[in-house]
UniProtKB/Swiss-Prot annotation:
Homotetramer. It catalyses: D-glyceraldehyde 3-phosphate + phosphate + NAD(+) = (2R)-3-phospho-glyceroyl phosphate + NADH + H(+); NADH + H2O = (6R)-NADHX; NADH + H2O = (6S)-NADHX; NADPH + H2O = (6R)-NADPHX. InterPro entries: GlycerAld/Erythrose_P_DH, GlycerAld_3-P_DH_AS, GlycerAld_3-P_DH_cat, GlycerAld_3-P_DH_NAD(P)-bd, Glyceraldehyde-3-P_DH_1, NAD(P)-bd_dom_sf. It is found in: Cytoplasm. The record marks H177 as: Activates thiol group during catalysis. The active site is at C150. Its main location: cytoplasm. Pfam families: Gp_dh_C, Gp_dh_N. It comes from Saccharomyces cerevisiae (strain ATCC 204508 / S288c) (Baker's yeast). This is Glyceraldehyde-3-phosphate dehydrogenase 1.
């Protein structure tokens, strides 16, 4: 059994918990969040406005949340270095705080006794891995790794398939992205990003994203060939990537569809999905794929210039990849 601890019990932390509980080879041992009491932690596991009520039983005592009869130790420690990961024999600490996302800060989990750390955010210093794209390049000497971002997890599998089959000369990505916790319910101060301070539920908000450039970190052959931006839109979950690329080799749209479908049914099964149905965003709520190619939504201008569309549940699909990466690094 892989013994894990979750630091940070927000959207991703709670969904990683839900998904990890479904895996037979993972045991969730502990949860740490300095801002959440046990009764409130249990409440937030039980009720979720986006993904629905937890179908099992949830309760708590003074030192645990209890899910389906399994006791999970709880802590309210601000400094991860003070957590008892050593005595709890933690194999992998999952850091989903968004705070301890660099090698020097995530090291606190190692200092506390965890064997390895998976960061659920992009990192400028920790090596980034996208399951299905470059995870097999992981080596056990890397104690701290990043699972990159939800958008990179959607874009990278598609970009890899297209680049391997036809070559990408250059490309631009736009993600039409659901609201997240960093946004405002009404107009408020946001000194670094003025647009980001505007009300999330009533606006389409242009925003920056490093997701496309990050693909170059997980696929070095695409370094410098992709960049992108985001539009934040008033939906609670599920986002969509629009990848517009100039190909190196000529291709028909049918050839592109066949290449993506072959990957989705073969080496990227479970990570990359494929659909030809007339779908909309809510159809992917709770989908565990990192990226679902929408074959009927893409368009082609010329044999080397295409726009490709891929959906992703930016919460659930991403959290599923976090759990996959936990399994991979723990067993490596």
């Amino acid at each position: 059994m892989i013994r894990i601890a979750i630091n940070g019990f927000g959207r991703i932390g709670r969904l990683v918990l839900r998904l990890a509980l479904q895996r037979k080879d993972i045991e969730v041992v502990a949860v740490n969040d300095p801002f959440i009491s046990n009764d409130y932690a249990a409440y937030m596991v039980k009720y979720d406005s986006t993904h629905g009520r937890y179908k099992g039983t949830v309760s708590h005592d003074d030192k645990h949340i209890i899910i389906d009869g399994v006791k999970i130790a709880t802590y309210q420690e601000r400094d991860p270095a003070n957590l008892p990961w050593g005595s709890l024999k933690i194999d992998v600490a999952v850091d989903s705080t968004g705070v301890f996302k660099e090698l020097d800060t995530a090291q606190k989990h190692i200092d506390a006794g965890a064997k390895k750390v998976v960061i659920t955010a992009p990192s400028s210093s920790a090596p980034m891995f996208v399951v299905g794209v470059n995870h097999t390049k992981y080596t056990p000497d890397k104690k701290i790794v990043s699972n990159a971002s939800c958008t990179t997890n959607c874009l990278a599998p598609l970009a890899k398939v297209i680049n391997d089959a036809f070559g990408i000369e250059e490309g631009l990505m736009t993600t039409v992205h659901s609201m997240t916790a960093t946004q405002k319910t009404v107009d408020g101060p946001s000194h670094k990003d003025w647009r980001g301070g505007r009300t999330a539920s009533g606006n389409i908000i242009p925003s920056s994203t490093g997701a496309a450039k990050a693909v170059g970190k997980v696929l070095p052959e695409l370094q410098g060939k992709l960049t992108g931006m985001a539009f934040r839109v008033p939906t609670v979950d599920v986002s969509v990537v629009d990848l517009t690329v100039k190909l190196e080799k000529e291709a028909t749209y049918d050839q592109i569809k066949k290449a993506v479908k072959a990957a989705a049914e073969g080496p990227m099964k479970g990570v990359l999905g494929y659909t030809e149905d007339a779908v909309v965003s809510s159809d992917f709520l709770g989908d565990t794929h990192a990226s679902i190619f929408d074959a009927s939504a893409g368009i082609q201008l010329s044999p080397k210039f295409v726009k490709l569309i891929s959906w992703y549940d930016n919460e659930y699909g991403y959290s599923a990849r976090v759990v996959d990466l936990i399994e991979y690094v723990a067993k490596a």
